[in-house]
């Protein structure tokens, strides 16, 4: 098992590749303490190990040194992430890694960095169109595929996902990303993997795209010392010509580091709050109910639910899948439910659901009972939660009616039939 130290600054998307790979493989990676970009990586000690001064950089426990984020991720990965035993899948992994570096990252930087004040805004820029063209390629690929290479998550998914983080955080607002539904589902699925959640924390999808702000650009340039080209030119004229020649190439050799500094600036952006925080908490305690439901028989847990339920601040909803006629294999239908749960992971704190599959292969339906804080559809509170809900018909139920109590009892106890008489097959709990 690989052990070592990773040199990087917080929330560097390039370092995420390696850290996520390590979560899958079990590699023991320590992130270097007190790393400061622009100082640590320019020190004589660091440059002796990594002459390029680039980050992320990795030092193994045996004293071996490796740079370039994709190479580090490969070292820390396991066989599955590298493509398994199939040479073609291995080649596909490399294909998508190259695609990320050559197509996604340049388009993302050209679109996002000017909006963050890192680069000047270019007139007649085609960055947005180029990024959307890249996303369209991905969308087509993912139309009939769950993952980018093979049937399981690989470095292809990890690297492409990491390269898309800035786009999904800063510019792909709902109206824009709606054109890339396949990519959206894949992106949120990867985001909600526990190995990814351990690395990419408190991430929120873009709600409103950034716009260029000249003031922000001026402030960033002043902070990094790059906003005074005229003053630098005047100083160079006053200095001796030999010195002027020495400094000219130095500035041209630093663009890669400027992009790393940009990532550092991105990490300082404020994170959004839990969408449920704006709603009254009421008296219903989801944690207590979930504990009772998990540990007690339905004969106790269901009466407990109705006894404690706060109808003033919480609501009960019935959700029915719109395209039941398209369902085929039972296991595939169950994957639809599980995938939705994964994409709604951050909603669990103030929600509960029992979603059931009725019927059999080629003749089945999906429907469920959902409970959450608030009186309106919870999915509209956050773009993160809007991937799947539109493929369901939603009906708000009267918590005090006997009909609702019977329906809740049926779904919470996994029993009965659907409205057309199909027998209960299996269920999934969102808690």
Curated annotation (Swiss-Prot):
* Induction or repression: Produces at least 2 transcripts by alternative transcriptional initiation encoding identical proteins; one of these transcripts (EF1gamma-RA) is induced by ecdysone signaling during pupation.
A single Gene Ontology CC term: cytoplasm
Enumerate the spans annotated as GST N-terminal domain.
2-84
Q: Where in the cell is it found?
A: Cytoplasm; Nucleus; Cytoplasm, Cytoskeleton
Where in this protein does the record say Phosphoserine is found?
294
Q: Does the keyword Transport apply?
A: no
What's the protein called, per UniProt? Answer: Elongation factor 1-gamma
Query: What species is given as this protein's source?
Result: Drosophila melanogaster
The gene is eEF1gamma
């Amino acid at each position: 098992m690989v052990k070592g130290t990773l040199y990087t600054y917080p929330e560097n998307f390039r370092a995420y590749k390696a850290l996520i790979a390590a979560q899958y493989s079990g590699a023991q990676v320590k992130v270097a303490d007190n790393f400061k970009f622009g100082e640590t990586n320019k020190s004589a000690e660091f440059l002796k190990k990594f002459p390029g001064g680039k980050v992320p950089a990795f030092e193994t426990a045996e004293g071996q040194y490796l740079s370039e984020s994709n190479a580090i991720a490969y070292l820390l990965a396991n066989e599955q992430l590298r493509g398994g035993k199939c040479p073609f899948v291995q080649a596909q992994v490399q294909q998508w890694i190259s695609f990320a570096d050559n197509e996604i990252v340049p388009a993302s930087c050209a679109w996002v960095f000017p909006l963050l004040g890192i680069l000047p805004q270019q007139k007649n820029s085609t960055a947005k169109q180029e990024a959307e063209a890249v996303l369209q390629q991905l969308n087509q690929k993912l139309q009939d595929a769950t993952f980018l290479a093979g049937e399981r998550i690989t470095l292809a998914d990890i690297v492409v996902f990491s390269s898309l983080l800035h786009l999904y955080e800063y510019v792909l607002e709902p109206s824009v990303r709606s054109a890339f539904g396949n990519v959206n589902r894949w992106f949120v699925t990867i985001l909600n993997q526990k190995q990814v959640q351990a690395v990419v924390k408190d991430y929120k999808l873009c709600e409103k795209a950034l716009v260029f702000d000249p003031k922000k650009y001026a402030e960033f340039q002043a902070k990094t010392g790059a906003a005074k080209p005229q003053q630098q030119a005047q100083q160079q004229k006053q200095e001796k010509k030999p010195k002027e020649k020495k400094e000219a190439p130095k500035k041209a050799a630093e663009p890669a580091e400027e992009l790393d500094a940009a990532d550092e600036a991105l990490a300082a952006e404020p994170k959004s709050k839990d969408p449920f925080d704006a709603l009254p908490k009421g008296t219903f305690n989801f944690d207590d109910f979930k504990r009772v439901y998990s540990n007690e028989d339905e004969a106790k847990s269901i009466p407990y639910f109705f006894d404690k339920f706060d109808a003033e601040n919480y609501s009960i909803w019935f959700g029915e899948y719109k395209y039941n006629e398209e369902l085929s294999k039972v296991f595939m239908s169950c994957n639809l439910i599980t995938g939705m749960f994964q994409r709604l992971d951050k909603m669990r704190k103030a929600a509960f659901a029992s979603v059931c599959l009725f019927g059999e292969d080629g003749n089945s339906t999906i429907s469920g009972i959902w409970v959450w804080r608030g009186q309106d559809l919870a999915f509209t509170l956050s773009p993160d939660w809007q991937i799947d809900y539109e493929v369901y018909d939603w009906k708000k139920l009267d918590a005090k009616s006997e009909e609702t109590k019977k329906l809740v009892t049926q779904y919470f106890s996994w029993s009965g039939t659907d409205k057309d008489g199909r027998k209960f097959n299996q269920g999934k709990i969102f808690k």
